[in-house]
Amino acid sequence: MRRIAALLALAVLAAGCGKGTATSLVPGADPKQGARLIAHYGCGSCHEIAGIEGGGRVGPSLHHFKDLRFIAGEIPNSPGNAVRWIMHPQRIEPGTIMPDLGVSEPEARDIAAYLYAH
């Protein structure tokens, strides 16, 4: 009986493993608000972003953002780096074509959550 209980406990733990959701990757962030902010800041005018109108081709496609190894080809893709990049791309890569848009940290977290979810 103990063996069955132990196996059941392992199965439950294993079921919880794997890739996290966007909200677990960016705790406390709201992907739906991220979509609204992406539209507000006009991100789709330069980037192709799943579920966002525009489909610009100036910046890189952000489809499958969570699968990218690097952000802007420069920094490792992680939620913290994504938030920093969204807030201050010019500080990270001076002269990059992506402008500083005055995105606050909570807004950047929501935008990152949306990108990781799509």
Residues covered by each model-derived region:
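Sec-dependent signal peptide recognition
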Residues: 2-7
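Electrostatic cytochrome c docking/interface patches
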Residues: 18-39
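C-terminal motif of bacterial Sec signal peptides marking the signal peptidase cleavage site
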Residues: 13-16
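Short cysteine clusters
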Residues: 43-46
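Secretory-pathway extracellular proteins and peptide precursors enriched for disulfide-bonded cysteines
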Residues: 8-9, 35
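Inter-heme linker and motif-flanking segments adjacent to c-type heme-binding CXXCH motifs
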Residues: 20-25, 51-53, 72, 117-118
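Extracytoplasmic electron-transfer domains, predominantly the class I c-type cytochrome c fold
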Residues: 36, 56-118
